[in-house]
Amino acid sequence: MDRSTDLQVGISTPWDLPSLSPTEQRRRLAAVADAGIDHVFTADHVSFHDGTGIDGLVRLAALSGLEPRLDLYLGVYLLALRHPMVAARQIATLAELAPGRLTVGIGVGGEDRHEFEVCGVDPGTRGRRTNAALALIRDLLDGETVAGDGEFYDFDEGRILPTPKPAVPLIVGGRSKAALERAGRYGDGWLAAWCSPRRFAEGIEIVESIGADRAPDWRHGLQLWIGVGTDVDDGRAQVSRRMAEFYKLDFEAF
């Protein structure tokens, strides 16, 4: 597949955007759209490390009406912390507000085990729980009537209407072997981070091989942390500081 014409570029939501007036928020987002950026990107955490976080779907809902030229990318949504019926309804509602503009990235998190514990979720089950929820959400967003998996979710005859038109791409994030398998089995693509171009290309091959029987319209992405400085060392220092502050890990761990 020739992907040379499929490239899109997004930018993370400005950290101070919520503190600005609606007029200033619109001005900044308009400047992003004027620059040719395709989408705005936001993360998702319930209570990360010191209690900080943001509900990614709520933030994108707020942004959706401020600049209609920009698509909306959630990366990544901690699905294991939500019930799949509720998550599917929220995704469907946002897709109705911004048809054709929403992409939802799904991840398992885990950098902060306490975030899962305070939500009543065993961190050790987050991968299997995400797999179960992702399979259910995909069927729900296709308009199917589903039953819970019997291990994590116990319900019958769940359904979400109306279904999003067009369908919402569900992209799976992560670097592990399990993440690549999850992307191939359940996703419409893979969202990579902290990997080389070679590793990115290899990961895409693995994902598409696993998902060959489904043959979706693959949409892969690579998340980059970029530091703008006076030179390479200054730019690297800015990135390393921000990543260490956010993840509470030494930069070299990445």
Regions found by a protein language model. Give the residues of each.
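Active-site-adjacent structural elements that line small-molecule/cofactor binding pockets in enzymes
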Residues: M1-F254
